[in-house]
Amino acid sequence: MFKTLTQNLTKIFDRLVNSGILTENQIDTAMRDVRVALLESDVALPVIKGFIAEVKQKALGQEVIKSVSPGQMIIKIIHEEMINLLASSESTTKLNLNSKPPVNLLMVGLQGGGKTTASGKLALLLKNQNKKVLLVSLDTYRPAAQEQLAIIANSVNIDSLPIVQGEQPLDIVKRAISEAKIFAYDVVIYDTAGRIQIDNVMMEEALAIKKILNPTETLLVIDSMTGQDAVVTARSFSDKLEISGLILSRIDGDTKGGAALSVKYLTQKPIKFLSCGEKLTDLEEFDAERLASRILDMGDIISFVKKAASIVDREEAERTAIKLKSGKFDLNDYLKHMRSIKKMGGFGSILSMLPGSGKIIDQIDQSKLDSRIIEHQEAIILSMTLKERKNPDIINASRRKRIAAGAGMTVQKVNILLKQYKQISAVMKKASKMNPQNLFRSGISKLFS
């Protein structure tokens, strides 16, 4: 979501690095450029003023001016200040479950902000930490809202409180408290009703619910795609409801990203999670340093490795590596590789985590990042015989025509798949000999150009 900001900052950094020793005037110019980049990304003005002042104060210090590489030093200062802008203490960033079970978590936010989906994602994350979780919908206003949460819960085998038609929110809360004790749940997540806009009735109801539950966390789900409106929403909820933390939803959207840089600073409430995709597994624990590195085009290799480790079987990866080195990487292996990429969020998600991607993102054919391409390629490979998958070189024109018909695709798409298979085979052979940034620039990027 930080594409524009990342590209603008990267251009500024390139000029800084290439300037050699920097004068005060050059630093002033760079700070003006950074200010414009932040404004264009919808970062709130008070945040920009504070950020620029801190960076400039440190950049004008003697230790920077006399540095061997002053441009790199200023980039380091900007990185550190962005971390400070986003970060909270570890004790407040971590989800607070320190209470006698069942622990109550209250989810609040505006309608359409991703609150219900975020509730499901958080429930799944806790389930994967061996917690017994109950999901409770308190939204009796939006049609089928309770059913939506029940469907989400059922899809990941998590319990949800049975729906009683006509029951009011406070009565649902009391029934949920009783059920949670009887069935010994560790955590109960309450999804409150959202509104199209903030109003007193909404706040009064949320306050009454909070008073009964005494939750360890009151989490505000903010839609990152709403720009400056997200900041207004966050401030209103923070002032009236005493929220304990923030979940930023739709962080993967094609937006300016300013909200993510503004809400924590202006509310002084910690960002706890990033909701970064449509799947219920797409919830990341917030890490200021990693997000700052991603924004500044330094990549997020830690997130990349964590995501890969949770999806890719280690033994299978080792077998694939051996096949690559021996030149025996076939279309069965390619299919497994594509399925792993799909589970990790697709090509776009992976590229965003690699260092240096911001500099060449405009050179990439965006249509080739479409997640449907993997689905099409899967259909094509499954239309091949086992012999063809093991020996792609035997796939001649007549075989390609038959495979295309069986998959419901064009022959051109079969040709593209076979070409990409050869390219990936070649690129992956180089992987062990190159660092991630050079690999991206010289190899992987060619697949999408």
UniProtKB/Swiss-Prot annotation:
PANTHER family recorded: SIGNAL RECOGNITION PARTICLE 54K PROTEIN SRP54 (PTHR11564), SIGNAL RECOGNITION PARTICLE SUBUNIT SRP54 (PTHR11564:SF5)
Pfam families found in the cross-reference section: SRP54, SRP54_N, SRP_SPB
UniProt GO BP: SRP-dependent cotranslational protein targeting to membrane
GO MF annotation, one: ATP hydrolysis activity
Major location (coarse): cytoplasm
Chain sites annotated for binding GTP: 109-116, 191-195, 249-252
Gene3D superfamilies from the UniProt entry: P-loop containing nucleotide triphosphate hydrolases (3.40.50.300), Signal recognition particle SRP54, nucleotide-binding domain (1.20.120.140), Signal recognition particle, SRP54 subunit, M-domain (1.10.260.30)
HAMAP family (UniProt xref): SRP54
Subunit structure: Part of the signal recognition particle protein translocation system, which is composed of SRP and FtsY. SRP is a ribonucleoprotein composed of Ffh and a 4.5S RNA molecule.
Family matches, as InterPro entries: AAA+_ATPase, P-loop_NTPase, Signal_recog_part_SRP54_M_sf, Signal_recog_particl_SRP54_hlx, Signal_recog_particle_SRP54_M, SRP, SRP54, SRP54_GTPase_dom
Domain notes: Composed of three domains: the N-terminal N domain, which is responsible for interactions with the ribosome, the central G domain, which binds GTP, and the C-terminal M domain, which binds the RNA and the signal sequence of the RNC.
NCBIfam families per record: ffh
Role summary: Involved in targeting and insertion of nascent membrane proteins into the cytoplasmic membrane. Binds to the hydrophobic signal sequence of the ribosome-nascent chain (RNC) as it emerges from the ribosomes. The SRP-RNC complex is then targeted to the cytoplasmic membrane where it interacts with the SRP receptor FtsY. Interaction with FtsY leads to the transfer of the RNC complex to the Sec translocase for insertion into the membrane, the hydrolysis of GTP by both Ffh and FtsY, and the dissociation of the SRP-FtsY complex into the individual components.
SMART domains to which the protein is assigned, alphabetical: AAA, SRP54, SRP54_N
Enzyme class: hydrolase
Cell compartment(s), UniProt: Cytoplasm
Transmembrane stretches, start-end: none
Catalytic activity: GTP + H2O = GDP + phosphate + H(+)
EC number: 3.6.5.4
GO terms for cellular component: signal recognition particle
Keywords: Cytoplasm, GTP-binding, Hydrolase, Nucleotide-binding, Ribonucleoprotein, RNA-binding, Signal recognition particle
Protein name, UniProt field: Signal recognition particle protein
Family of this protein: Belongs to the GTP-binding SRP family. SRP54 subfamily.
PROSITE patterns, per the entry: SRP54
